From Swiss-Prot:
This is Protein FixA. Required for anaerobic carnitine reduction. May bring reductant to CaiA. PROSITE patterns: ETF_BETA. Disulfide bonds: none annotated. It comes from the Bacteria. One of its GO terms (biological process) is carnitine metabolic process. The lineage of its organism: Bacteria, Pseudomonadati, Pseudomonadota, Gammaproteobacteria, Enterobacterales.
Length: 256
């Protein structure tokens, strides 16, 4: 059983600064970290490894220079995966969901897999598209919002999803792509033994050419800025008579 768990390196939001002059966001001092939602996918994959005989977990990511960071690679491997594959290319530096999904699908095909796990979204964009797009590109079943994995066999994965008014149980034929929610587990903090052992695990570094990836047309990012601050008018209407109600309705109409 070959399980791939996908993750994304994102800027640490605590270190993102706002430029007061134009509201643009400054990422220059923000270190890269594993997207918080992907920690749940990594944990879920490693828990499955304990259930499936001879299962192997491969962590997979596509991106830019952030993936060259040795500390970041060690952090991923210390959380349980057996190996790491990173696809590094300048074109993935600010990749949007379609481009990311296309590259992940190509890399997964090259690596081989029975099951792909993703987080529900990334901490930076949170588009919630990549997992489903990977399934569509590979033409295999894809399910998102999974809150519990019930069982795994050689050819079927059984999961639960918490819907608005009910709990849905699904049996998914493998190979498949599953995007897990944050309800599925609480990611463990790696032990010192796991951190030291991570340095001995294999890491494969691929380029876009290695996975046969051709760039796809994508929207280019022009600017990322914080929303402009608006001064509140602080209009207080006192009383409950008809005049006050009419004034309240008139003020509502102005902002709708």
């Amino acid at each position: 059983m070959k399980i791939i768990t996908c993750y994304k390196c994102v800027p640490d939001e605590q270190d993102i600064a706002v430029n007061n002059a134009d509201g643009s966001l400054d990422f220059s001092k923000a270190d890269a970290k594993i997207s918080q939602y992907d920690l749940n996918a990594i944990e879920a994959a490693c828990q499955l490894k304990q259930q499936a005989a001879e299962a192997q977990v491969t962590a997979l990511s596509v991106g830019g220079k952030a993936l060259t960071n040795a500390k970041g690679r060690k952090d991923v491997l210390s959380r349980g995966p057996d190996e790491l594959i990173v696809v590094i290319d300048d074109q993935f530096e600010q990749a949007l969901p379609q481009q990311t999904a296309s590259a992940l699908a190509a890399a997964a095909q090259k690596a081989g897999f029975d099951l792909i796990l993703c987080g529900d979204g990334s901490s930076d964009l949170y588009a919630q598209q990549v997992g489903l797009l990977v399934g569509e590109i590979l033409n295999i079943p894809a399910v998102n919002g999974v809150s519990k994995i019930i069982s795994l066999t050689a050819d079927t994965l059984t999961v639960e999803r918490e819907l608005e008014d009910e709990t849905e149980t699904l049996s998914i034929p493998l190979p498949a792509v599953v995007a897990v929610s944050t309800d599925i587990n609480s990611p463990q903090i790696p032990s010192m033994k796991a951190i030291l052992g991570a340095a001995k695990k294999p890491v494969q570094v691929w380029s876009a050419a290695d996975i046969g990836f051709n760039a796809v047309d994508a929207w280019s990012e022009q600017q990322v800025a914080a929303p402009k601050q608006r001064e509140r008018q602080r209009i207080v209407i006192e009383g409950d008579g008809e005049e006050q109600i009419a004034a309240f309705a008139e003020n509502l109409r102005k902002v709708i």
